[in-house]
Structures are given as C-alpha cells and as structure tokens.
Design a protein with these regions (language model features):
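RNase H-like (RuvC/DEDD) metal-dependent nuclease/polynucleotide-processing core
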Residues: 2-6, 10-60, 112-115, 120-249, ...
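A detector of long low-complexity, disordered segments enriched in serine/threonine/proline
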Residues: 95-106
Length: 357
C-alpha cells in the first residue's frame, strides 16, 4: 500500500526555521530509517515541510528534490509559549532520502503512496464536553472547521505560526499560555486517544497547554494550520486519518483479478514519538536516544535494523531520533491487521497511529 514512511518531529516555535523539525524516511523492509535533509541545507522550517509534502504527494515527482525554501507571506506577530528543543545550530551534512532509503535519490516516474506521521494533535478534545470550546458562541463543530478557524485567526502570522490563537478574543481564554496564566476556561482536558495512550504506554500533554517544556498547543496550532493548507492545495490527493477513512489495499488474486482502487497519494496520521519508545519498553528521557545501543534496541522493537556506531542524531533534544523511531513504527504498524480502525470519537478528535483502540 505504501512505499515510503516518513516520520516528522514537529515544532511550533516562532520563526522561519526550527532545529527541532526533523524528517526521517523508511522504505519497505527492515532498513534503518534515514534522514531527509532540508532544501536549504541548514534547518527545516514549517513552510519548507509543507512544500516538501506537496511535492511528495505527486507520485510522479522525485521527492528527493525538496525544492527551494521560499518562506511564506505575512507578519509573524503572535506570542506563544516556548517550544523547547529548538535551540542550537544544525550544521551537519546528511542524506536526502527521497530515493531508495540508502541515501540515493530516485528519478522513478511512478511512485506508490506515502504514509506521513507528524507529531502534533490533529484536533482538540471534543467528546468530553461535546464541543472544542465549550460555552463559546460560534465554536467550530468539526475538525475541518477547527482548522479553518485557526487558519483565519492566525492568517497574519508567517511560517504557519499559531500564536495568535492564544490572544484571540474568546478563544485565548481556553489556552494556558504566557499571555494568560490564569486562563479562565483552561482545563486539563484529554482526548480519547490520549486516555488510551496513557493506558497502554504514555500520553502527551493536554492540547490546550501552551506553556512549559511539555507545551503541546503551540505545535498543534501550527500543525492544524498546515493541514488546512495541505487540504486546500491537494484536495483528495491527501487523506487525513482517521478523520477520513483509509482502507488497506488487498493483493490481487485469481478470485479477484481487478486491483482495488489505489489509496490517496498521501495519508497523514498523528504520531507521538515518545509513545513508540515507551511501547518498546524504553524511556527516551535525558537524551537516552542519542546512544546507539538504546536506539538500536528501540528500532529493533519495531522491526527495523539498528543504527551504526557513528550514529549522532540531530537536534538539541535528539529530535532526529524521534523522527527515526516514528518512521520505523509507521512501517511496522501499517502492516498490522486492524491498524486503520479507530473509535467513533476519533472522527472529531483524531487518533494517535498505533495506539490500541
């Protein structure tokens, strides 16, 4: 069904580029996921990720050519919390794995579908209060409406930044942020997926928390803006699971000689890298994933070969390791029966790929 599996460790931090954004790609088999370098040769930014995804969704294009990072229009005026893990300078050289997963770019004219996992919440909690923003007049009532709302409020913020949400009249009172430490409507609400993740391994922080080291809201606001833009750009060529159902392809057989319809060119799923480490029985705290032995054990748990002795992940919080484990987990989970099933709540709140229903 998929011939590429891309894990993206995300960042909602302010600015055109973030050291915390890292991309890693796996291909079918057991090969260790390999890094995708930014087009600038320096750091990824959210606009560059958006442009890469648009190109990757075109099965006839060589995704090893990420193009030019041109930035996006608008003035970055929001003021959110601090998205940690984005400090430092990324100066190393790496591999653009648009090709065979071994660092060789491909010029094939035909490509299969690509499964992309990104580390942010695709929606806010809904089912606990039957609303994203309980008590707020005009609160969005679907995930697509939520993305549209965030995009409209943040339209003057460049680089898909989402900080304007935290100061928006009405909406800002739901977010715990540096602007609003006493947010009157903030609650530690959890999505059904987060409750399930906690029960089986580990859960992320509340999606309305925009402050501190476990800030989730800043990245999620930026991410929902990007999803909105991807749907506007690509339409049905991209499916956002589980908000849009994905049916696994079945092999052609003599009893069924006609191949089923191809899946969309790209399927986006929500990931939580820490969950994949903890589900493997490993704790990545204090940069443990920088150790080759630790990372090899984690990758092996997801059916992947391990890293070499020269393994040195990028990012101040070894963010590249998060992208790598996610790519390996995507490849493994996508081959698991029932992986595309999700509870009814997921249609409004999203679901973390691989968390048991």
């Amino acid at each position: 069904m998929f011939d590429r599996f891309v894990g993206i460790d995300w960042s909602g931090a302010k600015g055109p580029r973030q050291a915390g954004i890292q991309l890693s790609m796996a291909v079918p088999g057991r090969g260790v996921p390999t890094r995708i370098d930014p087009p600038s040769g320096h750091l990824w930014g959210r606009q560059a990720v958006f442009e890469w995804l648009v190109r990757a969704a075109d099965a006839g294009n060589d995704t090893g050519d990420a193009g030019t990072d041109t930035g996006d229009a608008g003035t970055d005026t929001g003021d959110a919390g601090t998205d940690t893990g984005d400090a430092g300078t990324d100066t190393g050289t790496g591999t653009d794995t648009g090709g065979d997963g071994n660092g060789n770019g491909s010029n094939e004219s035909a490509r299969g579908s690509i499964l992309v996992g990104i580390d942010f919440a695709f929606a806010h909690p809904f089912c606990d209060e039957n609303a994203y923003y309980p008590g707020l007049a005009g609160t969005p009532e679907t995930p697509a409406a939520l993305w549209q709302c965030i995009a409209d409020i943040c339209k003057n913020d460049g680089h898909f930044y989402g900080g304007a949400m935290f100061a928006a009249p009405g909406f800002g009172d739901y977010y715990l942020s540096p602007r609003n430490h006493g947010a009157p409507h903030y609650r530690s609400r959890r999505r059904v997926a987060e409750l399930a993740a906690k029960a089986s391994a580990r859960a992320p922080s509340p999606t309305f928390k925009a402050i501190g080291a476990d800030n989730v809201a800043t990245g999620s606001m930026a991410g929902m803006r990007m999803i909105h833009a991807l749907k506007a750009e690509l339409g049905d060529a991209v499916a956002v699971w589980p908000l849009q159902p994905v049916s696994p392809a079945r092999p052609v057989s003599p009893a069924r000689p006609v191949s089923p319809a191809r899946p969309p060119a790209m399927v986006l799923v929500e990931i939580f890298p820490s969950y994949y480490f903890h589900a493997a029985g490993l704790n990545p705290a204090r940069n443990a994933a920088a150790d080759p032995g630790f990372m090899t054990a984690a990758l092996n748990a997801w059916g992947s070969d391990g890293v070499g002795a020269d393994y040195a992940p990028r990012g101040s919080d070894v963010d590249e390791a998060d992208a790598m484990i996610s790519a390996a987990a995507l490849r493994h989970i996508a081959a698991t029966p029932g992986c595309w099933q999700a509870p009814q709540a997921a249609a409004m709140e999203g679901w973390i790929f691989g968390v048991p229903v």
